[in-house]
Amino acid sequence: MFIDKVTNKVNKSVDKTVLKTISKAKEYLSKGGLSLALSANKYEKLVPYNLWYNHELYQITNYTQNNQNMRIRFYNEIMLSPIVSYNEHDLSKIKTLVPNMSLYQPFYPETFYSVWEFLQSEYINQNAMNFLFIGKENKLGSVESLMIYNELYKNNYLNNTYTVWISDNESHDIFSNSYLLKLPKHNYLKQAFKINFLTNTNQLNVYDTIIIDAISQFDDIFDWSKEETDLHANLFYLFTSLKHLKKNTGSILFKFSMMSSQSWFYLFDILFGCFKEYEFFRPKCINPFNSEIYLYLNKFTGNIPKNNILNSILTNLYRQNVTKLFHLNLHHIDINPIFQKYLISRNKWIDNIIDYIDESPQQNNVCYVTKWHNKNNLLQIKDTTNYLDQNNDKYKLSNNSHPKIKSISHNFLLDNNHFKNLLQKRASLNFYKRVMDTRPSRIFLDMSMVHDFSNEYYVTWDYITGTLDFYKNIKNDLKKQYNGEMITTAWIKLYEILNEFPDIIPKKESVKSFHLCEAPGAFVSATHHYMYSLGCELDWYAQTLNPMYENKALDDHYGLMSLYPDKWLFGSKNNNTGDITSSEIIKSYASNKQLSNIDFMTGDAGIYCRPNCLNEQETVMAKINMGQIVCILACLSKGRSAVFKTFLPLTEPLNISLLNLLSSIFEELIFYKPGASNGSNSEIYIVLKSYKGISSSELEMLYLMLDDPKITSTSFITDVICKNFFRSYIKIVSNLIDKQINCLQRNFYYYYNIGELYDLKKNNIYSEYYDEWFNKNKVVYLENTLFS
């Protein structure tokens, strides 16, 4: 260490080069101010008005709609990002910028793109799992970028943890010798991501990677009045981080300003010997006049600076000027490897400023922004297309093996290149879903709230998907012209499936059906109407979560449960919750005489996913999905068929192994996406034709696995997976994911080209789909109604 505790002032001559450059830049910018500063950035259109200093016309405003908070940036009352408004006045002034903006509009764009650019350089250890961010609230784009990146590039992203310490306003608790931390007023990130905000430093854990971004906003382009305060704060954050960093593999990404080399020499000196690798990184996308730079410190040695120096610094924070408290021996700073690398980066920054001032080149910013997106693997708004294929999808799964039920490791999947490609498709799908995180949506709405959707000021995701629902006009006519009951999208989808696969219900005068996860009853109604059109009777039974026990059970919206209480089965006397993730419930159904000789079964399992769990829908549904499958195998008669709903991306080992099993014990297994199913959602229907049966011992093993908490979405429960099945499976699921991505792209396209959406409505495109649906699906007027 070159720091000694003395009272001498430090020689500031080392900053002369920086000060001289700043003086020249100030003189240049005095001719045009803000506009001249912004025009210097080739990537300005990436994040319009991304100011690193305070400006009276720049503001962040929170808007709340549908119980959702939106963080919206404005300059001079012009909406900057995210673009969420119908209001043409807001959009007109930046309309030319919109196509070149990123498709994903971050909550915190201020730092999102800088860190994204850093992450694309692949410095971060790919095995890092636990991350800590320490910094200002407006710099949370750093951790936002990290979460998106890990979802896109790491297969085990669900195991990652993200912790946030909002800097500023920490208060010391003398009783616990810790610091109390403030939470953000509006927790935007927690709406969409699983992230933990600390309230006390006692909650700190051990982390693989720590990001520190605690530099204050400047007062002007080069006016850093809080330099001394920022140095004190960053010393504290740095020392605290070293105590909570994993030894040997731990890393820190630390942002500071080159405005004052002097302040950061103390940090260079303290860090010398603490890490094996040092690298400076200055993102291309930031403004040339912005002095920020990142220092990446990798492979923590475990060495922490001497306690006497550390204690002297910490006990004098904010009390004395650091340069007065310590003497920095500048005669030896030249041998510090961090300082040597810093000089290279600092001189490059200075040279770039001088070159720009001297040349003032004309730049095609749009071209640079597009190149930046291409290089850093981010999509732009202009990359979306208005793909309008609403045709149904039907794929038959091949399997010539007979796997046995056995729990094995799923690691063999991770070594398969085809499976790796499928995981990449899952990552792409999740990214497209993420695009709507910062846009208003009714998924945040508490349904008990009264809300007038007709007067919404913002473009909502629901408005786009609702307008692109080409089958919505079918519902009214099914009710009015055909006396249809409980007409919902679910009704239309099952009716379409029954017509597409007429052989899944046997041709007999009376058919007995059993409907799983059925409330409020649309599948019963659709099957009843379909059977009536064939001149047959339906003897139906249904199950769902018992509303007496489960507040999450669906309401008896249409009154079918109260009208037919004997038709709704919830289990046994000992357990009548209706929870099909319990083998006890399924066994009670299998032994129930009312359910003997079942001809047809449906499963419509689903679960409410919180907005921050939408990319984990398949994982959350894993055991419920298994429950409805086991129930079908336990209750369905041999030779009969079933249909159940599941969700893409179908990459979880448990789902793959279950479908592997099903394809071997049914004559046919078909993936089907009805035309009436919203193309942008993840639901897929599995059609199971002609059940071959399963042995009692195999069924008992499935019961045990269903009840075993160790069997999760990552479990693989068959002993073999043949090439024929796997090749067929990968191809089918890949095609379905591609279709969903195309539909999501279409929705995003119309989000930004809403005028074309109005044109679709004017052109009455709905009539084409209306005619096609009724031509394909025979419907008759229902006289024998369920509610007679």
UniProtKB/Swiss-Prot annotation:
Family matches, as PROSITE patterns: SAM_MT_ADRIFT
Cross-referenced Gene3D superfamilies: 3.40.50.12760, Reovirus core
Organism: Acanthamoeba polyphaga mimivirus
Active-site annotation: 645
InterPro entries, sorted: Adrift-typ_MeTrfase, mRNA_Cap_2O-Ribose_MeTrfase, RNA_MeTrfase_FtsJ_dom
Keywords annotated in UniProt: Methyltransferase, S-adenosyl-L-methionine, Transferase
Annotated S-adenosyl-L-methionine binding sites: 521, 604
GO BP: 7-methylguanosine mRNA capping; methylation
UniProt KW Electron transport keyword: no
Residues annotated as domain Adrift-type SAM-dependent 2'-O-MTase: 485-693
One GO MF term: mRNA (nucleoside-2'-O-)-methyltransferase activity
PANTHER family, A to Z: CAP-SPECIFIC MRNA (NUCLEOSIDE-2'-O-)-METHYLTRANSFERASE 1-RELATED, CAP-SPECIFIC MRNA (NUCLEOSIDE-2'-O-)-METHYLTRANSFERASE 2
Name of the molecule in the record: Uncharacterized protein L511
